Amino acid sequence: MKVVEVKHPLVRHKIGLMREGDISTKRFRELAAEVGSLLTYEATADFETETVTIEGWNGPVEVDQIKGKKVTVVPILRAGLGMMDGVLEHIPSARISVVGIYRDEETLEPVPYFEKLASDMNERIALVVDPMLATGGSMIATVDLLKKRGCTSIKALVLVAAPEGIKALEAAHPDIELYTAAIDRCLNEKGYILPGLGDAGDKIFGTK
C-alpha cells in the first residue's frame, strides 16, 4: 500500500493547531476542511491530463484538462463530513457517496448503518475521507463496500493515522493509497490515537 505522510509546512502547522485541547468547534472545523484541501492536492498529483483547444480571449488556445475516471468523494459519517468541503474546493463536480459507520466503544469493531453511493462506482476514483485512522476498522469496512460496488481506484485521506491502523489497512487492502497529515505514536487501551486530536467528530460538530 502506498502511504504518503504529507510533511508540507502548512499541513504540519495546521495539524499542530488542531491538537490544542481547548480549540473551538469553529476553528477545528475550519482547520479540518483546510487540511482536507491540502491532502486533496497531494492525492490528485498523479491525475492524468489531456490537451484540449478552447476559445480564449484572443482566439483558440491549448490548455490542459483532467482526463480519465471521474471522482466521487466518500465521507465516512459523521466526522468525514468535516473534510468533504476541502475536497470539493478542488473538485466541485465530484459526486458525493456517503457511508455511515460507527465504532462500537466496547468491541472497537465497525458497525455499518447507512450507505448511498454513486451509481457508477466502477467508473470513478473514490477519495475516502475520515479524520482519524485509528484501528482501521471503519476505513477497511468502507473500502470493502466500495470494492463490492465495483470501485477499483481508491485513495484514503485522513488527518491523523496510527501505526496500528496503517498496518491493518495495508493487510486488508494493499492496493489502495493512503494520504495522511500525520502518523502519530500509537493507540491507547480505548483505541484512541496518541497524541491524536481527541474525538474529531465531537469537535467538528460540537456534540457528543
UniProtKB/Swiss-Prot annotation:
Entry keyword set: Allosteric enzyme, Glycosyltransferase, GTP-binding, Magnesium, Nucleotide-binding, Transferase
Gene name as annotated: upp
Ligand binding (uracil): I193, G198, D199, A200
Pfam families: UPRTase
Biochemical pathway: Pyrimidine metabolism; UMP biosynthesis via salvage pathway; UMP from uracil: step 1/1
Keyword Magnesium: yes
Entry keyword Oxidoreductase: no
Biological process, per Gene Ontology: UMP salvage; uracil salvage
Cofactor-binding details, from the entry: Binds 1 Mg(2+) ion per subunit. The magnesium is bound as Mg-PRPP.
GO molecular-function term, one example from the UniProt record: GTP binding
Protein name as it appears in the record: Uracil phosphoribosyltransferase
Reaction equations catalysed: UMP + diphosphate = 5-phospho-alpha-D-ribose 1-diphosphate + uracil
Functional note: Catalyzes the conversion of uracil and 5-phospho-alpha-D-ribose 1-diphosphate (PRPP) to UMP and diphosphate.
Domain of life: Bacteria
Regulation: Allosterically activated by GTP.
Record-stated family: Belongs to the UPRTase family.
Ligand binding (5-phospho-alpha-D-ribose 1-diphosphate): R78, R103, D130, P131, M132, L133, A134, T135, G136, G137, S138, D199
Cofactor: Mg(2+)
InterPro entries per UniProt: PRibTrfase_dom (IPR000836), PRTase-like (IPR029057), Upp_B (IPR034332), UPRTase/APRTase (IPR050054), Ura_phspho_trans (IPR005765)
EC number: 2.4.2.9
